């Protein structure tokens, strides 16, 4: 019996090794085109506006609000060692890399500093400790970092890309023999959205205009080197988010090369049997999440390709990707009954 099982295993393994790639040589050129249309990120230096206190408020979203304390310059001239904790407000939501500088005041620094930085999109995120978080998603997604500054003066740039408006800075450790300032805090905000969408007419209801501005800013921050499903968590391309964000882009930023890149990337990283996988993780190298085929997402890829054609008239790209769209229809048809 064992020799028979071994022989069968060997046969199936051999067949798998020689399995045909449904898209053949197309896959390589699709990935090359995806790389060709990878956008350059636009980097903008943003600085905090003010120091705030986060206080409970039953009428505010998630029961916390930010109350203005002082302009940011007041923090930069203040000895920080006895202050211990402070929260700053950038005045807008940003996606990018945060940095700050420290310098001693008076006596030379004779020891390192240690800070805890907590980043929040809304006031409640920096007000409520993360300690009680029960993991559903990875705890590592929560935006807090412990930073040790071994030498003063020094500029520290966090390696992690963050999505935030508020930053809470807590001093965890310092020498009692010198004091220091924190200064020159900034975020190098990034997006691939370079065009400026048209504003809604003044006659439109002010609330609708405000919703439109927030929606456009959200889309802008999701437009990185792919359409991310969220710049704070997950940070990857899903077909469902591609459909929604590309549709919004068609009527706002109109940067269709980003849509083209995503369409080619998904095609190039599809399963060997032609199935489109629902999600692509871009870094450190693009790769698809295996065995994640969703029928509705496969069809949304086709809808996105159609929307792209209507927005651009780019028939060459559509013909290039037609085998992918056709295959998704064939796959779905095999699982749909006549009724």
Can you say where each PLM-predicted feature lies in the sequence?
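Bacterial Sec-dependent N-terminal signal peptides
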Residues: 1-21
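Extracellular/oxidizing-compartment recognition motifs
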Residues: 20-229, 257-260, 273, 278-282, ...
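C-terminal capping/lid segments that line or modulate ligand- or cofactor-binding pockets
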Residues: 28-31, 35-39, 234, 252, ...
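Solvent-exposed loop and edge beta-strand segments that line ligand/cofactor-binding
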Residues: 87-90, 157, 227-239, 285-298
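Short, solvent-exposed loop/turn segments at the edges of secondary structure
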Residues: 95, 162-164, 240, 296-299
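Helix-terminus loop motifs that line ligand-binding clefts
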Residues: 125-137, 256-339
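Amphipathic, well-packed alpha-helical segments that form the structural scaffold of globular domains
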Residues: 216, 220-224, 243, 264-267, ...
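Extended ligand-binding clefts on enzyme/binding-domain cores
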Residues: 235-244, 248-253
């Amino acid at each position: 019996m064992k020799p028979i099982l071994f022989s069968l295993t060997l046969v199936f393994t051999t067949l798998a090794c020689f399995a045909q790639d449904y898209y053949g040589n197309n896959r390589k050129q699709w990935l090359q085109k995806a790389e060709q249309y990878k956008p350059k990120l636009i980097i903008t230096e943003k600085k905090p506006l003010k120091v705030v206190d986060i206080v409970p408020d039953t009428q505010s979203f998630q029961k916390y609000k930010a109350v203005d304390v002082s302009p940011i310059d007041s923090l930069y001239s203040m000895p920080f060692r006895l202050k211990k904790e402070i929260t700053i407000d950038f005045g807008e939501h940003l996606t990018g890399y945060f940095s700050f500088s420290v310098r001693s005041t008076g006596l030379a620094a004779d020891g390192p500093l240690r800070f805890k930085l907590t980043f929040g999109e809304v006031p409640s995120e920096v007000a409520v400790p993360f300690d009680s978080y029960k993991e559903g998603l990875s705890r590592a997604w929560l935006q807090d970092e412990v930073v040790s500054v071994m030498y003063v003066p020094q500029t520290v740039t966090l390696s992690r890309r963050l999505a935030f408006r508020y930053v809470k800075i807590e001093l965890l450790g310092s020498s009692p023999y010198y004091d220091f300032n924190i200064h020159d805090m900034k975020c190098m905000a990034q997006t691939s959205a370079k065009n400026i969408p048209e504003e809604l007419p003044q006659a439109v209801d002010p609330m609708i205009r405000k919703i439109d501005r927030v929606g456009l800013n959200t889309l802008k921050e999701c437009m990185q080197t792919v359409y991310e499903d969220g710049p704070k968590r997950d940070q990857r391309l899903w077909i469902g988010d591609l459909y929604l964000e590309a549709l919004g882009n068609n009527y706002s930023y109109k940067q269709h090369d980003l849509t083209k890149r995503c369409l080619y990337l998904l095609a190039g990283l599809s399963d060997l049997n032609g199935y489109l996988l629902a999600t692509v993780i871009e870094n450190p190298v693009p790769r698809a999440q295996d065995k994640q085929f969703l029928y509705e997402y496969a069809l949304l890829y086709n809808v996105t390709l159609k929307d792209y054609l209507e927005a651009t008239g780019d028939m060459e790209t559509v013909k290039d990707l037609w085998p992918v769209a056709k295959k998704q229809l064939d796959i779905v048809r095999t699982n749909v009954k006549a009724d």
